[in-house]
Structure formats: structure tokens, C-alpha cells
UniProtKB/Swiss-Prot annotation:
Broad class of enzyme this protein falls into: transferase
Function: Plays a central role in 2-thiolation of mcm(5)S(2)U at tRNA wobble positions of tRNA(Lys), tRNA(Glu) and tRNA(Gln). Directly binds tRNAs and probably acts by catalyzing adenylation of tRNAs, an intermediate required for 2-thiolation. It is unclear whether it acts as a sulfurtransferase that transfers sulfur from thiocarboxylated URM1 onto the uridine of tRNAs at wobble position.
Keywords: Cytoplasm, Phosphoprotein, RNA-binding, Transferase, tRNA processing, tRNA-binding
Name of the protein described by the UniProt record: Cytoplasmic tRNA 2-thiolation protein 1
Lineage: Eukaryota, Metazoa, Chordata, Craniata, Vertebrata
SUPFAM superfamilies: Adenine nucleotide alpha hydrolases-like (SSF52402)
Assembly and interaction partners: Component of a complex at least composed of URM1, CTU2/NCS2 and CTU1/ATPBD3. May form a heterodimer with CTU2/NCS2.
Gene3D superfamilies found in the cross-reference section: HUPs
Protein family according to the UniProt entry: Belongs to the TtcA family. CTU1/NCS6/ATPBD3 subfamily.
GO molecular function: nucleotidyltransferase activity; tRNA binding
Modified residues (Phosphoserine): S200
Main location: cytoplasm
Localization per record: Cytoplasm
Length: 382
């Protein structure tokens, strides 16, 4: 059976049928429709005003590659200036190859590129060093938690370095739907309530951020890269298999097989939740250490780094953060500074506090909480 004629130009043979509309389109017409939808998303959401200097988070992967290419095509109409900002997390055997892809893209499209590294920004810590530290505490699956927080901070610092007024990232609809599922499965109502907005307005000292590909499915992002002959880095991060996101991704695929519109349904549901009046969070404060936006005394990045520097990476995640809301020690990888652990109160030998009126003060945040184990006080080995 011959392929149908393109629904748009009525001349060329169709190369695909779009899942969301059912329209059969040829390659050029699909790319034009894709770019028009991204333009409509940016204009409808008032995401990038004329004259904006936009820092594009560039990882070398398909999403950031497509985002940079589309915005480069739309830049004259939007009146914006683009600057690629890449983050070197310090992942051996992975990030070096990805950064080469970013450099190649920057040279081909004649876009300025700035690379910022975890090691320079966070006192010598790289993701490989973080992974070794968290593995020693039995929390190897938390690598992506650390990386997500630190990467966000690094991108912010890189954007400020180049004088950007806005930050854009390549999160697509599948990424957003996975995040909605993750927040729901973890019972994180706060993130559910604010996770569907197209972008932040840049409260306080933070730069405005947005996701122009939020309503573009992963399949269509890949198809756009194919028809535009875009080359990108396609290997998965070596720490990704340990992440909880993988389970949400598998669940999303099952849901999509039963209901093709499941991805966009989840994205739009999160958007409606974020627009509800009751969902508006209280205004954020500032971190007592670095001045970044924070809902506690310390921002997430500083709290995570403190846990690593004190040899207590377990306490830097979840409820343990309350223990870390104290004056932090100097930044730096402890394995490079001293082999002795930071002095902390002697942990009690019990597993739980039996006296409801006298909760444990050595690591438990409430009656019945698990105390800090003695193994947590061991120095971090490089």
C-alpha cells in the first residue's frame, strides 16, 4: 500500500503520522509544524521577551541539541541572543565524549559556548567522587539526587557568567510526565503542585527558566533530529540505571501503550494543578551561606555538599537535611583535606527513641526516628 500524500503540502509522500493529531506529514512539513508549535509555546507563555540573552543548557543529547537548533531557527523572529552553557559533572568515560558533541554543535552553528565544571564550583567534588562517597554509605541510588541539584546550580552559575537573562532547558513531554509520576509515587504534594508550570519567573536572585519543549513528545524530538540531520550524543549516563526515574519511565511506557495520550494528559494535569490558587507556595527565603533561593536555612546544594564534606551523605537527603541546618564546615572534598571525620555528637546505641516526650537528639528528627549509625562517621575514601 503506497504512503499517503502529505496532509500539509499535498505534494510529497508522507513520512510519518503524528500521534497527537493523526495527520500524515512529510519530513519538511513535520519540521515546520514542530518549530511552529515551539514558537507558539514560547509566545503564549511569554517565556522569552525580545532582547533576552538566553543560556541554553547543552548536554550534547537529543533534547538539548533539538532545542538549540530550533531556537537558533526562531531567534530572528523572537529577537533573542543564544549562548550555549554546558556542565562538566566529572563522570569519567561519559561526559568527555558528550562535551565533544557540544563543542561540535557550537562550531557548526556558530554559537558561543561556555563550560562550567562541578570540580571548580563545588570545592573539588565531581560526580565520580560523590558516587564513591554515597556508595560507602549504602545510598548509591542517590547519585541522581545529588547530580540534579548540583547541575541546576552549575547551570545557574554558568548563565550568570555569560550575562544571560534567561535559562532554557530541553525537558520534553516524556520527561515532564515521568517527573509527575515520580512526585506522585513519592507522595511529594509540594512538587506536584508547582511542577507543571512552563517556567519560573526568576524570584529573588534566580534567573527565569523555561522549557520550550515541554509539550513535544520524545518520539517527535527524535524524529525532528532525524529529518534535520542533527548529530547528538546518545549514550546513557553510567549512573542512570540506579535512578528511581527509570521505574517511572517503565510505568509510563505501559500507560502509553494502553492510552497513547497518557504523556500529554499527565503534563496538562500537572499544569492545571500548578495554576490552582491553593498550589502557590510561600515566597522563598535565601540560603544563609550562598544567598541562593531556599526554603530552609540552607539551600539544597549547600545541604548536599555539607553532608558530603562531613562524611554523612545519607543525612543530606530527605529528613536528614534537618540535622545539617547548622553552620557548615569549609567547602571541599574531605578526602583531599583530611582523613579524620568531622567531630559530631556520639550517636546513641538505640535504633529508636522509646520515650515519646524525649526524642533522640543524635540524628533522629522526631520520636521513633532512626539514629545516626556509627558507620556514618567513617572518613570518605577517595
Amino acid at each position: 500500500m503506497p504512503a499517503p500524500t502529505c496532509f500539509s503540502c499535498h505534494k510529497a509522500r508522507a513520512a510519518l503520522r503524528r500521534p497527537r493529531s493523526g495527520q500524515a506529514l512529510c519530513g519538511p512539513c513535520f519540521c515546520a509544524a514542530f518549530e511552529a508549535e515551539v514558537l507558539r509555546t514560547v509566545l503564549a507563555g511569554h517565556l522569552l521577551p525580545q532582547g533576552a540573552v538566553v543560556a541554553v543548557g547543552a548536554s550534547g543529547g537529543k533534547d538539548s541539541t533539538v532545542l538549540a537548533h530550533v531556537l537558533r531557527e526562531l531567534a530572528p523572529r523572537l529577537g533573542i541572543t543564544l549562548h550555549l552553557v554546558a556542565v562538566d559533572e566529572g563522570i569519567g568515560g561519559y561526559r568527555d565524549a558528550a562535551l565533544e558533541a557540544v563543542r561540535s554543535q557550537a562550531a557548526r552553528w556558530e554559537l558561543p559556548l561556555t563550560i562550567v565544571a562541578y570540580e571548580d564550583l563545588f570545592g573539588g567534588w565531581t560526580m565520580d567522587a560523590v558516587a564513591r562517597s554515597t556508595a560507602g554509605s549504602g545510598r548509591s541510588r542517590s547519585c541522581c539526587t545529588f547530580c540534579g541539584v548540583l547541575r541546576r546550580r552549575a547551570l545557574e552559575e554558568g548563565a550568570r557568567l555569560v550575562g544571560a537573562t534567561h535559562i532554557v532547558t530541553g525537558h520534553n513531554a516524556d520527561d515532564m510526565a515521568e517527573t509527575v509520576l515520580m512526585n506522585f509515587l513519592r507522595g511529594d504534594a509540594g512538587r506536584l503542585a508547582r511542577g507543571g508550570v512552563l517556567g519560573s519567573t526568576g524570584e529573588g536572585c534566580a534567573l527565569p527558566r523555561c522549557r520550550p519543549l515541554q509539550f513535544a513528545s520524545q518520539k517527535e524530538v527524535v524524529l525532528y533530529a532525524h529529518f534535520r540531520h542533527l548529530r547528538y550524543f546518545s549514550e546513557e549516563c553510567v549512573y542512570a540505571p540506579e535512578a528511581f526515574r527509570g521505574h517511572a519511565r517503565d510505568l509510563l511506557k505501559l500507560l502509553e501503550a494502553a492510552r497513547p495520550s497518557a504523556v500529554l494528559d499527565l503534563v496538562h494535569s500537572a499544569e492545571r494543578l500548578a495554576l490552582a490558587p491553593a498550589a502557590k507556595p510561600p515566597p522563598p527565603g535565601t540560603c544563609s551561606r550562598c544567598g541562593a533561593l531556599a526554603s530552609n536555612k540552607l539551600c539544597q546544594a549547600c545541604a548536599l555538599l555539607d553532608g558530603l564534606n562531613r562524611g554523612l551523605p545519607r543525612l543530606a537527603i530527605g529528613k536528614g537535611r534537618r540535622v545539617l541546618q547548622v553552620e557548615p564546615p569549609p567547602l571541599g572534598n574531605p578526602s583531599r583535606v583530611t582523613s579524620d571525620p568531622v567531630a559530631l555528637p556520639e550517636p546513641c546505641t538505640c535504633k529508636q527513641s522509646k520515650d515519646e516526650s524525649n526524642p533522640c537528639g543524635n540524628g533522629g528528627d522526631r520520636a521513633g526516628a532512626t539514629c545516626v549509625s556509627k558507620s556514618d562517621l567513617s572518613p570518605v575514601a577517595e
